[in-house]
Amino acid sequence: MVEKSIVQEAKDIQLAMELITLGARLQMLESETQLSRGRLIRLYKELRGSPPPKGMLPFSTDWFMTWEQNIHSSMFYNAYRFLLKSGHCEGVEVVVKAYRLYLEQCPPGNNGDAPILALTRAWTLVRFVDSGMLQPTECRCCGGTFITHAHQPVNSFVCSLCQPPSRAVKKRKLSPQPADTNSQLLDGFAQKAM
């Protein structure tokens, strides 16, 4: 019989608690800890007050390619790569720290909205890139690094910030900050006033 380490079990419980707090799905918890499914479900119920959601994990790379999700996924992945290269952390710890950085930059709305990129999707994104299904690619216009399908031809990718889809303009709300307003819109208003 293999003896379980009490220290390792305590670390797994602490990690599971942090992942549950950030919104991880049960499959992610099972993959990243050595705790039994039953213990994870009990821990989830204790922390969240409800059982974990049922269903399969996202398995399609297409979700990461739509304009808004791509921007958020790319922001997370760039933070992930930076932390990974720094060498101060590894494994799921890098995913958690990068996700916390992402949440600092893209906080959920005040209405209790969920963030656009959930922790489990961020974790799945890392797995997709590691398996070669997705890759980071440089935008030929702005030079930013964005997530694309694997084997994207070199110098052919234009990000959705440089070339936003028409529906993106409809969703955008103008900021009250003068530096954030679009000068073309202001010029258009000035011409209409004359």
Curated annotation (Swiss-Prot):
Needed co-factor(s): Zn(2+)
Assigned protein family: Belongs to the FlhC family.
Keywords tagged on the record: Activator, Bacterial flagellum biogenesis, Cytoplasm, DNA-binding, Metal-binding, Transcription, Transcription regulation, Zinc
Localization of this protein: Cytoplasm
Superkingdom classification of source: Bacteria
SUPFAM superfamilies, per database record: FlhC-like
InterPro entries the UniProt entry points to: FlhC
Pfam families to which the protein is assigned, alphabetical: FlhC
Protein name per its UniProtKB record: Flagellar transcriptional regulator FlhC
Record flagged with keyword Disulfide bond: no
Example of a GO cellular component annotation carried by this entry: cytoplasm
NCBIfam families: PRK12722.1
Summary of the function given for this chain in its UniProt record: Functions in complex with FlhD as a master transcriptional regulator that regulates transcription of several flagellar and non-flagellar operons by binding to their promoter region. Activates expression of class 2 flagellar genes, including fliA, which is a flagellum-specific sigma factor that turns on the class 3 genes. Also regulates genes whose products function in a variety of physiological pathways.
Subunit structure: Heterohexamer composed of two FlhC and four FlhD subunits. Each FlhC binds a FlhD dimer, forming a heterotrimer, and a hexamer assembles by dimerization of two heterotrimers.
Cofactor binding summary note: Binds 1 zinc ion per subunit.
Gene that this sequence comes from: flhC
Positions contributing to Zn(2+) binding: 139, 142, 159, 162
Biological processes per GO annotation: bacterial-type flagellum organization; positive regulation of DNA-templated transcription; regulation of bacterial-type flagellum assembly
Chief location bin: cytoplasm
Molecular function (Gene Ontology), one example: zinc ion binding
